[in-house]
């Protein structure tokens, strides 16, 4: 559904705050919201995507934020962090100024994550903590946005139980924030503006990037994989690729501004370009084009093994500014569990992909994601995950207990692995993760590595910290002037998840950019 169609069919619905908790909200959801539905969602076709390059904030909204401040609390993935940069850009264009003091902020937005129950619980706790602030300062605006806003159960819970919230908007209509804010200021009711269908791809949105060293670059939106445990295809919508020329222009501008590293973002970056109907162009082609731009480091995330092509492997193997680090979520090492998860690959095909990657990129660092305690996972099936970890020798992994998400196919399965069993398995897995991380780190002792210095260490302000091209954290002492620069560091000590070293020298740009 594009912007014109949406305007023609939109229905303005406001939820009255002073109604009783028993109020029936079904009419609201009938008109503007559809709860997650796998059967219906999978029917979504390859509709034409419209690209809006003429976005601009209406003059009548400029100045709305003069002498007002804002604060955004962000939960979740890199995509959410990037959305926060866009939201901040729009707010500053309206005249608002950022603040870090939640007690004085005039607009407080909570950008939410729906991937796990724990993340949602943190958000509800945060909203609850703001109730006293709303009583003390009734003129402030409190908003909830992000992936949780796309869930019916969440919106319903906020409407019924959190009257301190002034506005709710989702992942598809961030560019309508000026109108949402205006309505929130003028209305005595909670403003709910959630789109269940994707809109146009909006280019040239203002952004306030976090720092001037590393930058996120969105290359696509949404996901069509429908893994049975995942809510993302519902909260982020169908896959929509940005045009390559728009992405390349953005990366060139970041290079001109002096950024040292970019990360190409998407729920499944390996699907990039599949929906571009007029050209054959994939992530490998995009990486090739970006490799010619004078920016020292280029990363991409997140990858799905099913879509990882030999073309991509070949491009990464050529080196240059494409880093030799690939995050390749496996989730489980057992075929039966992978099938129930809807991952579309097998243990054998995953290991074959790993072999092809290692053959072409011998110095590659592989990391992964793993879910423990999926419904019906037996001890033997879990042990196959452990043996797969041994076979691959991942340098790091992000590990999680299975978290049931309403609206997903997995939510209909009986969560029949006891919590104590899940925790015990996670502990065993994490022990293995630490073991292989230590092995990977130990290889750096005595070596000199190139580090992108990002700032002071979180533990010691007198120590600087940064990351290698393989995403290894390095702590070292050096002049503060090195922040934002590529430097050489000799590694003196390898810890399990970080490295300590001694500053050698600054790296000249021509030594890095090829």
UniProtKB/Swiss-Prot annotation:
Task: Identify which cofactors the protein needs according to its UniProt entry.
Answer: [4Fe-4S] cluster
Q: Where is this region: Disordered?
A: 1-21
Binding-site list for [4Fe-4S] cluster 1 = 77, 113, 147
Write one Gene Ontology MF term.
metal ion binding
Pfam families, alphabetized = Radical_SAM, TRAM, UPF0004
Does the record bear Ribosomal protein in its keywords?
Answer: no
Q: Read off the SMART domains from this record.
A: Elp3
Show where the Radical SAM core domain sits.
209-440
The protein's UniProt keywords, in alphabetical order, are:
4Fe-4S, Cytoplasm, Iron, Iron-sulfur, Metal-binding, S-adenosyl-L-methionine, Transferase, tRNA processing
Where can this protein be found?
Answer: Cytoplasm
PROSITE patterns assigned: MTTASE_N, MTTASE_RADICAL, RADICAL_SAM, TRAM
MTTase N-terminal domain segment(s): 68-186
Instruction: Quickly give the catalysed reaction.
Output: N(6)-dimethylallyladenosine(37) in tRNA + (sulfur carrier)-SH + AH2 + 2 S-adenosyl-L-methionine = 2-methylsulfanyl-N(6)-dimethylallyladenosine(37) in tRNA + (sulfur carrier)-H + 5'-deoxyadenosine + L-methionine + A + S-adenosyl-L-homocysteine + 2 H(+)
Q: What is its EC number?
A: 2.8.4.3
| Cofactor binding annotation | Binds 2 [4Fe-4S] clusters. One cluster is coordinated with 3 cysteines and an exchangeable S-adenosyl-L-methionine.
- Binding positions ([4Fe-4S] cluster 2): 223, 227, 230
Q: Which GO terms describe its cellular component?
A: cytosol
* Similarity comment: Belongs to the methylthiotransferase family. MiaB subfamily.
The entry's function note states: Catalyzes the methylthiolation of N6-(dimethylallyl)adenosine (i(6)A), leading to the formation of 2-methylthio-N6-(dimethylallyl)adenosine (ms(2)i(6)A) at position 37 in tRNAs that read codons beginning with uridine.
* Subunit and partners: Monomer.
HAMAP family assigned: tRNA_metthiotr_MiaB
NCBIfam families attached here? miaB-methiolase, MiaB/RimO family radical SAM methylthiotransferase
Q: What is this protein called?
A: tRNA-2-methylthio-N(6)-dimethylallyladenosine synthase
């Amino acid at each position: 559904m594009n912007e014109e169609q949406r305007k023609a069919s939109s229905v303005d619905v406001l939820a009255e705050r002073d109604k009783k908790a028993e109020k029936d909200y079904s009419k609201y959801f009938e008109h503007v919201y559809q709860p997650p539905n796998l059967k219906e969602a999978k029917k979504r076709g390859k509709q034409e995507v419209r690209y809006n390059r003429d976005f601009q904030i209406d003059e009548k909204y400029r100045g709305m934020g003069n002498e007002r401040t804002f604060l955004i609390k962000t939960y979740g993935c890199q995509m959410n962090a990037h959305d926060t940069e866009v939201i901040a850009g729009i707010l500053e264009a309206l005249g608002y100024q950022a603040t870090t003091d939640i007690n004085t902020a005039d607009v407080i937005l909570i950008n939410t994550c729906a991937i796990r129950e724990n993340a949602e619980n943190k958000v509800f706790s945060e909203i609850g903590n703001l109730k006293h602030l709303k009583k003390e300062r009734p003129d402030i605006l409190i908003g909830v946005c992000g992936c949780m806003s796309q869930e019916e159960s969440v919106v319903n819970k906020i409407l019924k139980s959190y009257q301190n919230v002034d506005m709710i908007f989702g992942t598809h209509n961030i560019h309508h924030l000026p109108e949402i804010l205006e309505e929130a200021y003028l209305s005595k009711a909670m403003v709910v503006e959630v789109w269940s269908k994707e809109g146009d791809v909006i280019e040239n949105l203002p952004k306030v990037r976090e720092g001037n060293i590393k930058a996120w670059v969105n290359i696509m939106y949404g996901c069509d994989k429908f893994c049975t445990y995942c809510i993302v295809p519902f909260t982020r919508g169908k896959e929509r690729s940005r045009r390559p020329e728009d992405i390349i222009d953005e990366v060139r501008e970041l290079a001109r501004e002096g950024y040292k590293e970019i990360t190409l973002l998407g729920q499944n970056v390996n699907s990039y370009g599949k929906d571009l109907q007029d050209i054959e162009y994939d992530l490998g082609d995009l990486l090739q084009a970006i490799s010619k731009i004078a920016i020292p480091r280029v990363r991409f995330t997140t990858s799905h093994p099913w879509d990882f092509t030999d073309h991509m492997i070949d491009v990464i193997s050529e080196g240059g500014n494409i880093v030799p680090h690939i995050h390749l979520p496996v989730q489980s090492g057992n075929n039966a569990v992978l099938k129930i998860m809807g991952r579309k690959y097998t243990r054998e095909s995953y290991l074959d992909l790993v072999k092809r990657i290692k053959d072409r990129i011998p110095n590659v660092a592989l990391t992964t994601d793993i879910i423990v305690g999926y419904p019906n996972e037996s001890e033997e099936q879990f042990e196959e995950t452990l043996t797969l970890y041994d076979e691959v020798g991942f340098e790091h992994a992000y590990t999680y207990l299975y978290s049931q998400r309403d609206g997903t196919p997995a939510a209909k399965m009986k969560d029949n692995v006891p919590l104590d069993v899940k925790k015990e398995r996670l502990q065993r897995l994490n022990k293995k993760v630490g073991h292989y991380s230590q092995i990977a780190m130990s290889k750096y002792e005595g070596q000199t590595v190139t580090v992108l210095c990002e700032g002071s260490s979180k533990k010691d302000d007198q120590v600087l910290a940064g990351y290698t091209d393989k995403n290894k954290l390095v702590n070292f002492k050096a002049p503060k002037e090195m922040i934002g620069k590529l430097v050489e560091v000799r590694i003196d000590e390898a810890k399990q998840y970080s490295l300590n070293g001694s500053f050698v020298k600054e790296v000249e740009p021509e030594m890095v950019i090829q």
